[in-house]
């Protein structure tokens, strides 16, 4: 039986925009904070993927997992095409998720 909760599929990148990491979480603010601090070892931490570029919300975990799996199979150009309408300038969306001041966030992420 499926449970209804909040799940997010998201894309983060590094300061050079050279890596696109796709993940899924049930707590986007917590997970973005983990990426930004680098406290969770793994691919995203190794490549310093700390800037949130894109996210989607789902109410069912099965749908979020399916979408994450789908996006991970996409080419880089297709992922860029997905990001562009929501975030054409590739700005870090983390401050709006974390409730941070935009100016202070820019200082911390450089």
Identify the meaning behind each predicted range:
Residues 1-41, 45-57, 62-69, 86-88, ...:
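GIY-YIG nuclease catalytic motif and its immediate N-terminal context
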